[in-house]
Amino acid sequence: MQDMKVNTASFMQLYAWYSWPNVILCFFGGFLIDRVFGVRLGTIIFGLFVFIGQIIVAVGAFTDAYWLMELGRFVFGIGGESLAVAQNTYAVNWFKGKELNLVFGLQLSMARLGSTVNMNVMGILYNKVAQTYGSGHSCLGISLMIASVTCLFSLACALILGFLDKRAEKILHKEQGKTGEVVRLTDVKDFPASLWMVFMVCVGYYVAVFPFIGLGKVFFEEKFGFSAPSAGAVNSIVYVISAPASPVLGFMVDRVGKNILWVLVAVLATLGAHVMLAFTFWNPWIPMSLMGVAYSLLACALWPMVSFIVPEHQLGTAYGFMQSIQNLGLAVIAIAAGSILDSSGYLFLELFFCICLCFALIATVLLYLIDLIRDGGLNLSSRERDKKRELDAAEARRAELRRRESQRDLTRLGPRSAFALRNRYLCRLGAQLPAHYSLQLSSLACRSLLK
């Protein structure tokens, strides 16, 4: 902010510009991969968007053009979320069953590891560059340009992965992976109230975590007197903890069940962490560590609930809408958080985050009540959920059997061909027909002769 001479509200616009394109693109990322580009080309294209966006941000900083940095973040956002969809498509195509749970956990862990490295290394890199070129926007631009090497590495991985996937397709005779997501905006009107509560929990929770981490480093420097490296370390502890904790907590939630209960625990824990940061001078490692565990727990418990609520053919729309609302909330709250910090300070900003978490808490309680009234099964134990799934599957098989029997009955009553009608007419007149014409017609013929 000092190098570019902008206030906090303008700085938070960089976060908002990443989220704005994803309010729309979350719906169409899967469609573009399935129908337009394919997973291999789509991964490369979206990786290229990320790389180009980072280059534009670096050039904007180097030339002291803040509007160019905002444009770069917009381009970066176009590729970022859709690249995650492509990554998930590869995972689903190559791993099945229990392997897939581990793969998704490792994906989240690697993402959080990257965030941790960014928070702790970029400050050191900036200081090293400043020793040679001096501080200022030029130093910032050079640092960001060096950081773009990681985006170039990501693009190289996309190219290598595309080559390996193409080779495997020829050897194993596999089809190119698809997301399986069919986005129909008309499905939104059929979403039950419980799903809307999940959306509200998602928005209320994440807007109190990501914008806070974006502003947290300066908060720890000003309130607790931390040095820049120490402030960066405590600010990144949320991601440090979530990297190893996500697979472990995901396994626990999968084994225990009770998803709503875990979501409630996560929201309350995060609310407690923000209250401690706002009203006490306790060591911030304590509330930030608590927030890290709660953040991982909520992700493991909240997102799978969507698949328990809506049928499989609506999952693409549901997850797309959930991500869209999340990005809309992050874009709006990021701007609001910057304005509150500039005008009122960190205490009121923390109170604002507490209000957002209270909103998520109310939505969680309403979700529990709705699920309890409608017997939705979101808070069942793992064993109860498996039993319910077996009963639902058996009922579905019986319904399918009844449907097929009804269809066969309708087929018998359906209109016949001209040849069949002619034979039926002849049978009514008593004419003898060859037996191989139709057993039913032969019986009619015989019955007519007995009259």
Predicted regions located by residue number:
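Helix-to-loop junctions at the C-terminal end of transmembrane segments
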Residues: 24-38, 245-258, 341-342
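Conserved MFS/SLC helix-loop-helix module at the cytosolic interface between two early adjacent transmembrane helices
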Residues: 24-66
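Cytoplasmic helix-loop-helix junction between adjacent transmembrane helices
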Residues: 72-110
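Extracytoplasmic gate region of multi-pass secondary transporters
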Residues: 192-243
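Symmetry-related core transmembrane helices of the 12-TM Major Facilitator Superfamily/SLC fold
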Residues: 141-160, 350-367
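Glycine-rich segments within core transmembrane alpha-helices of 12-TM secondary carriers
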Residues: 101-127, 325-333
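Cytoplasmic membrane-interface "Motif A"-like loop-to-helix N-cap segments
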Residues: 35-47, 254-267
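C-terminal transmembrane helical hairpin of 12-TM major facilitator-type secondary transporters
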Residues: 257-305
